[in-house]
């Protein structure tokens, strides 16, 4: 499946690059052959560009294992999107315009996206509804794709409300367990003491890697946690269920997992712009705008440089494509000729909501055309 992008390009080239002929098989010359040729080239490129955009939309959904684009409105996104340091860091440092085509190395990607960071929001659990009927925070569901031995980092982020005067805050994270004979229902995970000064509220992170790994090994032990953060006057500062004006302050888990890219061979090709008169196989610029699709579920990038391949692959280019020429010489009637296709593609990093309203930061392979060639 990882060769899908290449096959799509081969198909598109064959469809749009066949020379027009008359019904009797003879070519129809015109007085402005050169001008018409340039116009035809522009038309070919425009068709290729449109087809490339449609192919990208299909590939993204397929590689993310989504049957359709998640139906999440901008208002819902505003409520769910944490206004927290790790998420803002991902957005601020986003490498959306990377173009490493000058680098001769290639990444040999698998077909499906690889996950690097998962931001999981809490959900309600029946076990967390206490005797008084009030739900307690928090319960986190985890994807079966997360393997405990691949977890590099796991942090619980909580938002502490602002204070009016300097105070010491005692933070306690408790893990819920099945009731013991003595009635115990909690066991401690982390406790910490921190000083807060007047001003805006703050985000605080707590390492929960060991707890997460245990949950992944034994899913039945994941009954949820309770968060407490009291100041010196006994006021609970932890935002567990955001009130008015507290959108984006939900607790959440930030999980980072390993990802080991592979390297492959070197390749070279031509680069052109939209005004180029180059007839040979060439890479042309193409920017994909997700906002134009109405894909609000993609947090970042909002747009990226995808590029596309277009141009002719003639057998006269022997010094550039010797292997194809040898095949044609051995079987001239059995070869359909070389097609202009990507010979180097690289991934893009994407921050997005999946169908379960989880925020995923992952790498989608083969989404940027870095090199074009004839094959």
UniProtKB/Swiss-Prot annotation:
Organism domain of life: Eukaryota
SUPFAM superfamilies assigned: Cystine-knot cytokines
Biological processes per GO annotation: muscle cell proliferation; negative regulation of myoblast proliferation; negative regulation of satellite cell differentiation; negative regulation of skeletal muscle satellite cell proliferation
Propeptide stretch(es), residue numbers: 24-266
Protein keywords: Cleavage on pair of basic residues, Cytokine, Disulfide bond, Glycoprotein, Growth factor, Secreted, Signal
Localisation per UniProt entry: Secreted
PROSITE patterns membership: TGF_BETA_1, TGF_BETA_2
Family affiliation: Belongs to the TGF-beta family.
PANTHER family: GROWTH_DIFFERENTIATION FACTOR 8 (PTHR11848:SF150), TGF-BETA FAMILY (PTHR11848)
Protein name: Growth/differentiation factor 8
Source organism of this protein record: Excalfactoria chinensis
């Amino acid at each position: 499946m990882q060769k899908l992008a290449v096959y799509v390009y081969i198909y598109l080239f064959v469809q749009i690059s066949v020379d027009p002929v008359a019904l009797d098989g003879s070519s129809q010359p015109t007085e402005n052959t050169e001008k018409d040729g340039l116009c035809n080239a522009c038309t070919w490129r425009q068709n290729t560009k449109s087809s490339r955009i449609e192919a990208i939309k299909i590939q993204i959904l397929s590689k993310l294992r989504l049957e359709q684009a998640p139906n999440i409105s901008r208002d819902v996104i505003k409520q769910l999107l944490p206004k927290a340091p790790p998420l803002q860091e991902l957005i601020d440092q986003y490498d959306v315009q990377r173009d490493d085509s000058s680098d001769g190395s290639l990444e040999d990607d698998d077909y499906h996206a690889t996950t690097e960071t998962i931001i999981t929001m809490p959900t309600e659990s029946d076990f967390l509804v206490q005797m008084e009927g009030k739900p307690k925070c928090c319960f986190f569901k985890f994807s079966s794709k997360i393997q405990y031995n691949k977890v590099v980092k796991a942090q619980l982020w909580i938002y502490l409300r602002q204070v009016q005067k300097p105070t010491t805050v005692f933070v306690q994270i408790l893990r819920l367990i099945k009731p013991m004979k003595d009635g115990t229902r909690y066991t401690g995970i982390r406790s910490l003491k921190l000083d807060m000064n007047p001003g805006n509220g703050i985000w605080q992170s707590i390492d929960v890697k060991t707890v997460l790994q245990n949950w992944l090994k034994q899913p039945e032990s994941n009954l949820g946690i309770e968060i407490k953060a009291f100041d010196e006057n006994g006021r609970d500062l932890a935002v567990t269920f955001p009130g008015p004006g507290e959108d984006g302050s939900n607790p959440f888990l930030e999980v980072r997992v390993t990802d080991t890219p592979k390297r492959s061979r070197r390749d070279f090709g031509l680069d052109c712009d939209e005004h180029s008169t180059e007839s040979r196989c060439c890479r042309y610029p193409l920017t994909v705008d997700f906002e134009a699709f109405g894909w609000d579920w993609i947090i970042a990038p909002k747009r990226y440089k995808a590029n596309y391949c277009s141009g002719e692959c003639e057998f006269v280019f022997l010094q550039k494509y010797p292997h194809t020429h040898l095949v044609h010489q051995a079987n001239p009637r059995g070869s359909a000729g070389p097609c202009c296709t990507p010979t180097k593609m690289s991934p893009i990093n994407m921050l997005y909501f999946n169908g379960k309203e989880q925020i995923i930061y992952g790498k989608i392979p083969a989404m940027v055309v870095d090199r074009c060639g004839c094959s």
